[in-house]
Amino acid sequence: MEAEAAMEAEAAPAAATGAVRVEKVRGRSAVTRCFAKYPLKLIAPSKAGRASSGAAWLYAITYGGGIVSGDIISCTVAVGDGCAAAMTTQASTKVYKAVDSKCSEQVLEARVGEDALFALIPDPVTCFSMARYHQKQVFHVFPNSNLVVVDWFTSGRYESGEKWNFSFYKSINHILLEDQPLFIDSVLLEQSSNFSIADRMQEYNVVAMVILLGPKLKHIQDQMQDEVKKMMSVQLRPPTSAGGRYSTRSQPLHPQRPPIIASCSPFGRMGTGMVARITAVSTESVYSFLRHHLAALEPFLGACPYPAS
């Protein structure tokens, strides 16, 4: 076992703390390579979903349950042609207080083969007070590749009164179609002398983005777009007075904001991809949103993402 581990370490890129390869083995998607070193740990359970789905599952875990100041986690994932793989976590990724202004960093580079499916469905990132976090994710795809990306973060330990107290958060997502840019997105939150992050975010505690790309996911895209449009048309509808059009009854100057706000936008040629953006007051409301809208992935993955505990 030690000799095998040494060979894996030598084969992995020098800067990588993790490397995964998924290939077809006897008609099923299987993890044929799984290398990780501190501070990353990768677990590939043999039974994570229905066997009939033929999908491979992978759990990314950090020692101690979080990322400390100065840690750099770099992982590569290769999903072979016709394979299906899901990468998730067991709990939210905690980012601890920065020391000497050092960022905690995560970098993921994934290659999704032809007619393959890769679902990156982690729990949210939770930055503690004074934390600094930077994340970059790059996905290489083909015209018939299928990709699900959930990228989300919370305000911190808000139930304990720690709300938007981190110093810096940046997340970058790139999708390259045959090495040409297809989707580029960046989210940046940084404390300012004029307005704090808390001032700007008001009562909202969660920000999320969901990317759906590929022919196998078109029905999920369409359903999500339709349901989000209906949900927001109801939530953002101006209040009407019971007295009718000419009523003098006063309306509230500051109507209550909806507990969850979402929007959907297509991208790519012929709308082959879709991005949904969500902000919400509570983490559980986003879990419910993801659980509902991604339930249709079960036939591909053998299990529903974000199952109710």
From Swiss-Prot:
The Gene Ontology terms for molecular function here are: nickel cation binding
InterPro entries, alphabetized: UreD
Query: Keywords of this protein's UniProt record, alphabetized?
Result: Chaperone, Nickel insertion
Would I find Lipoprotein among this entry's keywords? no
Q: Where are the transmembrane segments?
A: none
Instruction: State the source organism's domain of life.
Output: Eukaryota
Job description of the protein = Required for the maturation and activation of urease via the functional incorporation of the urease nickel metallocenter.
Note the subunit structure.
Answer: URED, UREF and UREG may form a complex that acts as a GTP-hydrolysis-dependent molecular chaperone, activating the urease apoprotein.
Matching HAMAP family:
UreD
Q: Which family does it belong to?
A: Belongs to the UreD family.
Query: What name is this protein filed under?
Result: Urease accessory protein D
Q: Which organism is it from?
A: Oryza sativa subsp. japonica
Q: What is the lineage of its organism?
A: Eukaryota, Viridiplantae, Streptophyta, Embryophyta, Tracheophyta
Identify the gene encoding this protein. URED
